[in-house]
């Protein structure tokens, strides 16, 4: 059938359409039936399309002989009036189905239908049939208007062509863009699959505070708020890490949390000020076991949700089936920068010269560890297309990770990169309270030196470590970026229902 969705209109015409619809609503109010709320839905379009998909089996005669009747509701997405009979399409959360409407059956309801608009929400009851073109249809015996739509939907051919408008008016985007709906359905399935995977392995899901007295758990600038009753400044959490590790101290040996973090930083195709993370901790695991876990949960989630481990993301074909590469950070830097020697990697003066040569801007306070990271981010990160664990980060940029037993100045840490984007971060946790206190103190000095992303000193966390924390491995996976990977989305805003936007003027 040909859908009759209004074409794009200039503002004046749109206003006239809205006025026309408001007049129709006024007439409904006069009849006392503006927004009825007594209809109970029993069937969904997608379920019917799946059950009766075989047109050879479910012929019009077979459908009529089945005696099957349905009771459903949805948004009117198309209508074609042809005198005594009409066709329409309604859309619910599961899909669309066609309606076949007859004036001699519906009576006054058919007359009313002629005045309804695309976008209205309607209820229908009736049997099933199939048109000459083979399309499954509901042969309506009853029809009602449930909600009057006052604003016209975008043109079906162009949809919401303005990307910013899609983000601002996600409610419209979800109505008219099936691909957008599918992304968010997959997002829900991804999170559900990860929860099931962890629950099956004796991990306990927990909830930790969203407002912190002391911001910690990541090097990031926090959002600040104020508790009026206590006259106390609080911080939206940048990470749940320190609270989750307190739970490990308390004997909850496998814990995880899937929740929001907040970082007062820039907005880009990869970053949103609030974002979702999976963070977990497992006692008696090293960063090697946590890398194994990371690889397996991502691979199994892809297989569960997509039915495959092969995905396309931002122009790259990614295969999650083979073992993920594991590559030391200093080795990766030297591979991509032959001018940098092994000795240079821990030599601040040498790295400063390399940064100058590479035109990498750095701060005077950076030691060799931070300089090495800057060179990695500028010259290596974007080249990591297939899944790659970058391991053994410098202590300077890993304030919560355990120091390496064999490599002074390095830690037992990893980050997972896919197509040049960081998806996960993990390490063997630092459980030496004296070492942790010294690291916190170094962070405080960095903050005093102007680094507004450096951590605060958390005395209570040090006290918790003094009770003793078992050797522990930890992991954080960016859920938003994982959803980007598994849905092929190129912007984080495409996988957030309501991404951060500047307020409209």
Curated annotation (Swiss-Prot):
Pfam families tied to this protein: tRNA-synt_2 (PF00152), tRNA_anti-codon (PF01336)
Keywords of the record: Aminoacyl-tRNA synthetase, ATP-binding, Cytoplasm, Ligase, Magnesium, Metal-binding, Nucleotide-binding, Protein biosynthesis
A GO cellular-component term linked to this record: cytosol
Cofactor: how bound: Binds 3 Mg(2+) ions per subunit.
Catalysis: reaction(s): tRNA(Lys) + L-lysine + ATP = L-lysyl-tRNA(Lys) + AMP + diphosphate
MF (Gene Ontology): ATP binding; lysine-tRNA ligase activity; magnesium ion binding; tRNA binding
A single GO BP: lysyl-tRNA aminoacylation
First-level EC class: ligase
Domain of life the protein comes from: Bacteria
Gene3D superfamilies noted in UniProt: Bira Bifunctional Protein, Domain 2 (3.30.930.10), Nucleic acid-binding proteins (2.40.50.140)
The protein's required cofactors: Mg(2+)
Binding site for Mg(2+) 2: 422
CDD domains: LysRS_core, LysRS_N
Binding site for Mg(2+) 1: 415, 422
Subunit details: Homodimer.
Name used for this protein in its record: Lysine--tRNA ligase
Organism: Xanthomonas oryzae pv. oryzae (strain PXO99A)
Species classification: Bacteria, Pseudomonadati, Pseudomonadota, Gammaproteobacteria, Lysobacterales
């Amino acid at each position: 059938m040909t859908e009759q969705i209004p074409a794009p209109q200039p503002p004046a015409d749109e206003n006239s359409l809205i006025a026309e619809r408001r007049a129709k609503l006024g007439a409904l109010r006069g009849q006392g039936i503006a927004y009825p709320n007594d209809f109970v839905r029993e069937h969904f379009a997608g379920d019917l399309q799946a059950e009766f998909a075989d047109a050879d089996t479910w012929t019009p005669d077979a459908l009529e002989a089945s005696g099957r009747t349905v009771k459903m509701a949805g948004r009117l997405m198309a209508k074609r009036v042809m005198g005594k009979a009409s066709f329409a399409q309604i859309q619910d959360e599961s899909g669309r189905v066609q309606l076949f409407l007859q004036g001699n059956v519906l009576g006054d309801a058919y007359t009313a239908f002629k005045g309804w608009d695309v976008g209205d929400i309607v209820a229908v009851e009736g049997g099933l049939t199939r048109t000459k073109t083979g399309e499954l249809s509901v042969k309506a015996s009853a029809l009602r208007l449930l909600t009057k739509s006052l604003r016209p939907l975008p043109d079906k051919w162009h949809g919401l062509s303005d990307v910013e408008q899609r983000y601002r008016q996600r409610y419209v985007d979800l109505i008219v863009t099936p691909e957008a709906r599918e992304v968010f359905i997959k997002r829900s399935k991804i999170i559900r699959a990860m929860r099931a995977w962890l629950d099956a392995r004796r991990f306990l899901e927990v909830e930790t505070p969203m407002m912190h007295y002391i911001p910690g758990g990541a090097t990031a600038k926090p959002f600040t708020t104020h508790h009026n009753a206590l006259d106390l400044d609080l911080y939206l959490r940048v990470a749940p890490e320190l609270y989750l590790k307190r739970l490990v101290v308390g004997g909850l040996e496998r814990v995880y949390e899937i929740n929001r973090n907040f970082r007062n930083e820039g907005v880009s195709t990869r970053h949103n000020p609030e974002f979702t993370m999976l963070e977990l901790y497992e006692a008696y695991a090293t960063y090697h076991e946590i890398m194994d876990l990371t690889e397996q949960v991502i691979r199994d989630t892809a297989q569960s949700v997509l039915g495959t481990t092969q995905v396309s993301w931002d122009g790259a074909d990614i295969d999650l089936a083979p073992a993920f590469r594991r590559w030391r950070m200093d080795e990766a830097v030297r591979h991509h920068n032959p001018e940098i020697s092994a000795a240079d990697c821990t030599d601040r003066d040498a790295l400063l010269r390399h940064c100058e040569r590479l035109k990498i801007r750095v701060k005077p306070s950076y030691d060799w560890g931070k300089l090495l990271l800057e060179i990695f981010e500028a010259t290596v990160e974007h080249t990591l297309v297939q899944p790659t664990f970058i391991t053994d980060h410098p202590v300077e940029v890993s304030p919560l990770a355990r120091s390496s037993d064999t490599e002074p100045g390095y830690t037992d840490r990893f980050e997972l990169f896919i197509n040049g984007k960081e998806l996960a971060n993990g390490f063997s946790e630092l459980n030496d309270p004296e070492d942790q206190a010294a690291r916190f103190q170094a962070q405080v000095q960095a903050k005093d030196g102007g680094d507004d992303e450096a951590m605060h000193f958390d005395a209570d966390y040090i006290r918790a470590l003094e009770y003793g924390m078992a050797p522990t491995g930890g992991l954080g996976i960016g859920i938003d970026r994982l959803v980007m990977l598994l849905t092929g989305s190129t912007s984080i805003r495409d996988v957030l229902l309501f991404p951060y936007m500047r307020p409209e003027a």
